[in-house]
Amino acid sequence: MNPSVQISLNRIGDREISTVLLYRFDNEPRAWETCIFEDNGNSDVVARYVTEAEAIAGHNSYVFAMLQERNTQLA
């Protein structure tokens, strides 16, 4: 199994958002990915990034959007 490096994990309501660095079969870094996992078992890769800075910024923007959506639902 190839390693992955997780830079962030957040849980918002019934969803979890995770951003990780994935590696190729030869253990060379491949890409950063942000995934959303739902309690019902559904999951989806929502973004891919080239750099760690892009991954952090992208992850934070998804978290912000999910928080806004949740706050709108609760209002």
Where in this protein do the model-derived segments appear?
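Generic alpha-helical secondary structure signal
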Residues: 27, 53, 63-66
